[in-house]
Amino acid sequence: MEAILMIGVITLCVIFLLSGRNNKKIQEARELEDYLEDLNQRIAQRTQILSELNEVITNRSVDKSVNMSACEIAVLDLYEQSNIRIPSDIIEDMVNQRLQTEQDVLNYIETQRTYWKLENQKKLYRGSLK
């Protein structure tokens, strides 16, 4: 009888130890899953940063023949297709600004066109010439 009791106690101890190991393995698996999820989030963030940097590099690349960036050339092509002439003063100032995106270039050109339109509409006062 004592032998059966000993075997029962040993069996319970073995079951208890094995269940403890399984809990540790489950906990380790959860920790690894959390770590992998964190790594995937980091990879997604780094991929987004990399794509933004690639876009900046593309926008900053300068065409040596005209000394303008790709986004400036693209916006000027849009104006050319629309048969809108841009004064050379605006283009020279735009090149010196080194704008980053096509939207920035477009906004700058439109602002300058509005300014020069208003400036060119000014009239000389009649009493100024005598």
UniProtKB/Swiss-Prot annotation:
Keywords attached to this entry: Coiled coil, DNA replication, DNA-binding, Early protein, Host cell membrane, Host membrane, Membrane, Transmembrane, Transmembrane helix, Viral DNA replication
Localization, UniProt: Host cell membrane
Region DNA-binding: start-end pairs: 70-130
Residues spanning the membrane: 1-20
Record flagged with keyword DNA-binding: yes
Recorded GO MF terms: DNA binding
Involved in dimerization (site feature) positions: R113, W116
One record GO biological process: DNA replication
Site residues by UniProt (Involved in oligomerization and DNA binding): N120
InterPro entries, A to Z: Phage_DNA_replic_GP16.7, Phage_DNA_replic_GP16.7_sf
Task of the protein: Binds to the long stretches of ssDNA of the viral DNA replication intermediates created during the protein-primed mechanism of replication of the viral genome and attaches the viral DNA to the membrane of the infected cells. Required for the redistribution of replicating viral DNA from the initial replication site to membrane-associated sites surrounding the nucleoid. Required for the second pull step of DNA ejection.
Complexes and interactors: Homodimer; homooligomer. Interacts with DNA; one dsDNA binding subunit is constituted by three p16.7 dimers.
Protein name, entry field: DNA replication protein 16.7
Organism: Bacillus phage PZA (Bacteriophage PZA)
Lineage: Viruses, Duplodnaviria, Heunggongvirae, Uroviricota, Caudoviricetes
Gene encoding the protein: 16.7
